[in-house]
């Protein structure tokens, strides 16, 4: 599967042209995209500026010699390539399994062409089998946890090595084990209006193209 993920990442990189501002995604498949951009910068003289979606991707891009700018310094991103944890037939998706959902959504929002690279296991009929990440400020997070629990959302604080996971932006993540999300847009609206929620992992209708790596090769889905 790694070879297919690599092929998907390399294929996505073909959408990147000289002079572009490029959003560099986070995750196991997006990793190969960033590697390919780095190779083209070094070997082909590709001239691009990258905007990263996590500290991990920043380190990777710097190591490859990709010039970077902060999201604060740009108004439009030409193309962003990132991964996803689930994608439904309406091009709604869940992201944030790696904990970078806030920065990923900040980079996705001003992007003209937003591309996801995934393996075929990520294609689902209905979102929700993958736990929905919700990034929350630490202050009041226990109360927010109880609110989610009272709604039957089966929340859990994300942990790493026995401690609470802290995002690159210094927040906690509460994962919601919803099993099935019947109305992603309604849930996104609810979470958008919940005080203490910084961002959530529902990316509804944002993506233009999904490059799928499967056992029979690549499939490119477009809106």
UniProtKB/Swiss-Prot annotation:
The gene is rpiA. It catalyses: aldehydo-D-ribose 5-phosphate = D-ribulose 5-phosphate. Homodimer. This is Ribose-5-phosphate isomerase A. The active site is at residue 104. Keywords: Isomerase. Pfam families: Rib_5-P_isom_A. It comes from the Bacteria. Substrate binds at residues 26-29, 82-85, 95-98, 122. One of its GO terms (biological process) is pentose-phosphate shunt, non-oxidative branch. NCBIfam families: PRK00702.1, rpiA. Pathway: Carbohydrate degradation; pentose phosphate pathway; D-ribose 5-phosphate from D-ribulose 5-phosphate (non-oxidative stage): step 1/1. It comes from Streptococcus agalactiae serotype V (strain ATCC BAA-611 / 2603 V/R). Belongs to the ribose 5-phosphate isomerase family. Catalyzes the reversible conversion of ribose-5-phosphate to ribulose 5-phosphate. It is an enzyme of class 5 (isomerase). Its EC number is 5.3.1.6. InterPro entries: NagB/RpiA_transferase-like, Ribose-5P_isomerase, Ribose5P_isomerase_typA_subgr, Ribose5P_isomerase_type_A. GO terms for molecular function: ribose-5-phosphate isomerase activity. The keyword Isomerase applies.
């Amino acid at each position: 599967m790694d070879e297919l993920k690599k092929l998907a990442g390399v294929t996505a990189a073909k959408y990147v042209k000289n002079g572009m501002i490029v959003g560099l995604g986070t995750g196991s498949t997006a990793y190969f995209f960033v590697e390919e951009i780095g190779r083209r910068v070094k070997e082909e003289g590709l001239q691009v500026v990258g905007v990263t979606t996590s500290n991990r991707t920043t380190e990777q891009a710097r190591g490859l010699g990709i010039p970077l700018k902060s999201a604060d310094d740009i108004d439009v991103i030409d193309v962003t390539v990132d991964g996803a944890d689930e994608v439904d037939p309406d091009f709604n998706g869940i992201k944030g399994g790696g904990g970078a959902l806030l920065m990923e959504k900040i980079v996705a929002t001003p992007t003209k062409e937003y591309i996801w690279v995934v393996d075929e296991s990520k294609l689902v009929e209905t979102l929700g089998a993958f736990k929905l990440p919700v990034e929350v400020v630490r202050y009041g997070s226990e109360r927010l946890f109880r609110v989610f629990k009272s709604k039957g959302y089966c929340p859990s604080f994300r942990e790493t090595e026995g401690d609470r996971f802290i995002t690159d932006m210094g927040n906690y993540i509460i994962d919601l084990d919803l099993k099935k999300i019947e109305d992603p847009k309604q849930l996104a609206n609810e979470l958008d209006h919940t005080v203490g929620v910084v961002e959530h992992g529902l990316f509804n209708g944002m993506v233009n193209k999904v490059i799928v790596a499967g056992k029979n090769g690549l499939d490119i889905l477009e809106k």
